[in-house]
């Protein structure tokens, strides 16, 4: 039975199951949660989502992200990076600002990559920023969180050129083919991030994941975006990870407990949390 609590949908099966989940991509520090961040985190913990990876965006939200993480050490693990859609004419200043935080404890370089969906105006700058940040990750022996919206081929070509760096990481919100996944496996220790899109009708990733080993999958929400069914249309949050896990279990014919255990173990291994 599903019931409403404080205006949010809760499922007591998840809350009482003692299964542990990791949300490997949450922007719970986003202004969409202003004044509610701590409550949203508590809902996540109550649902078994005890650890959240916070990918960085840019200087506009970075300080808020670290402040939130500092209040909840052990639950929140912040990262550092310049999001490709934040790369514009002043991108070098943004990069310099980001490097001021390099003495902070971080668990990955990200969210980084190339975005060809919104604009290609600064595509060359996106490519250069990606290379710089891949080198930063290699130097610090950190995983990377890759944003690849309509740019997977470009990023794979970059990874081939940077193979000597020994990179590892996750392709966030993976929407590629099985063939692309197999190509990634030849380039290093790469996982795919599966989120709310998996629950949508006609989502192509639902077919692809059937042939991808569970040992290569980690779960994510991309909160406050990409809300899973049955909550699509409202703000996403980390407490919804179990619904993504449930759908993955249904599609792959796997027990929910196995999905929870394996994806959580994968996240612990990749991010060293």
Describe these PLM feature segments.
Residues 2-273:
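Mid-domain alpha/beta scaffold segments of enzyme catalytic cores
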């Amino acid at each position: 039975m599903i019931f409403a609590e404080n205006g949010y949908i809760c499922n007591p099966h998840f809350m009482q199951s003692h299964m542990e989940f990791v949300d490997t991509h949450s922007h719970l520090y986003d202004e969409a949660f202003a004044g509610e961040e701590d409550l949203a985190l508590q809902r996540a913990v109550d649902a078994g989502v005890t650890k959240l990876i916070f990918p960085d965006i840019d200087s506009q939200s970075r300080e808020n992200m670290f402040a939130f993480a500092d209040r909840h050490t052990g639950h929140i693990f912040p990262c550092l990076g310049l999001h490709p859609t934040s790369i514009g004419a002043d991108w070098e200043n943004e990069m310099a600002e980001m490097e001021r935080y390099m003495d902070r404890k971080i668990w990955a370089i990200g969210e980084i990559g190339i975005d060809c969906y919104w604009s290609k105006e600064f595509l060359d700058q996106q490519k250069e920023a990606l290379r710089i940040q891949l080198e930063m990750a290699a130097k610090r022996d950190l995983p990377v969180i890759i944003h690849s919206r309509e740019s997977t081929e470009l990023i794979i070509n970059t990874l081939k050129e940077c193979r000597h760096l020994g990179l590892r990481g996750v392709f966030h919100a993976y929407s590629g083919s099985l063939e692309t996944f197999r190509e990634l496996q030849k380039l290093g220790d790469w996982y795919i991030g599966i989120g709310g899109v998996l629950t949508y009708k006609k989502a192509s990733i639902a077919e692809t994941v059937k042939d991808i080993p569970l040992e290569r999958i980690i779960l994510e929400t991309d909160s406050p975006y990409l809300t899973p069914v049955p909550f699509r249309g409202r703000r996403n949050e980390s407490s919804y990870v179990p619904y993504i896990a449930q759908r993955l279990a249904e599609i792959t014919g796997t027990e929910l407990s196995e999905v929870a255990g394996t994806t959580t173990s994968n996240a612990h291994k990749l991010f060293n949390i």
